[in-house]
From Swiss-Prot:
Residues 18-167 form the Globin domain. Monomeric. Homodimer; disulfide-linked in vitro. Also homooligomeric in vitro. Its EC number is 1.14.12.-, 1.7.-.-, 1.11.1.-, 1.15.1.1. CDD domains: Cygb. Belongs to the globin family. Disulfide bonds join C38-C83. Its main location: cytoplasm. It is found in: Cytoplasm; Nucleus. It comes from Homo sapiens. Pfam families: Globin. Keywords: Cytoplasm, Disulfide bond, Heme, Iron, Metal-binding, Nucleus, Oxidoreductase. The formation of an intramolecular disulfide bond between cysteines Cys-38 and Cys-83 specifically enhances the nitrite reductase activity. It is an enzyme of class 1 (oxidoreductase). This is Cytoglobin.
Length: 190
């Protein structure tokens, strides 16, 4: 079963800590290596996200019907979105030294996803967790605890900025209806 955190998740604001200079450098160095394979890494992240959290596909008319991970990997629309996600993350990571720029970029992302796409903000937390999983796997032998903590701080920073943008636009959590699946869904058929 897929578990998607509910409304309390948004109310519990993540503690967002600034990254130290050493943490910024550690994240940026690892990110540079990941971003060298931007499209493939982005696709791996999104495929895992959609396989593990299929309810997230409801926001993507172009590939919400896809079940097969290989079909997802080959989808030009998914690949294009993966590049957009990686590009936004790249802008954030490259500008970790500039909190105003980070805030501005994440506010734009949050507002677009709230107003235009109507994406529940909890999916940003879920996606950032998937990103951390992929990073940990890619760098299993080179991911010391202090670097893991830096990435966890980055995750909190992203989520807090995005949810702040949702609150700024007056986001109200969507109530499940005929087109929006409930928070808990069976992961397979009957």
């Amino acid at each position: 079963m897929e578990k998607v955190p509910g409304e309390m998740e948004i109310e519990r604001r993540e503690r967002s800590e600034e990254l130290s200079e050493a943490e910024r450098k550690a994240v940026q160095a690892m990110w540079a290596r990941l971003y060298a394979n931007c499209e493939d890494v982005g696709v791996a992240i999104l495929v895992r996200f959609f396989v593990n959290f299929p309810s997230a596909k409801q926001y993507f008319s172009q590939f919400k019907h896809m079940e097969d991970p290989l079909e997802m990997e080959r989808s030009p629309q998914l690949r294009k979105h993966a590049c957009r996600v990686m590009g936004a993350l790249n802008t954030v990571v490259e500008n970790l030294h500039d909190p105003d720029k980070v805030s501005s970029v994440l506010a734009l992302v949050g507002k677009a996803h709230a107003l235009k796409h109507k994406v529940e903000p909890v999916y940003f937390k879920i996606l950032s967790g998937v990103i951390l999983e992929v990073v940990a796997e890619e760098f299993a032998s080179d991911f010391p605890p202090e670097t893991q903590r830096a990435w966890a701080k980055l995750r909190g920073l992203i989520y807090s900025h995005v949810t702040a943008a949702y609150k700024e636009v007056g986001w109200v959590q969507q109530v499940p209806n005929a087109t929006t699946p409930p928070a808990t869904l069976p992961s397979s058929g009957p």
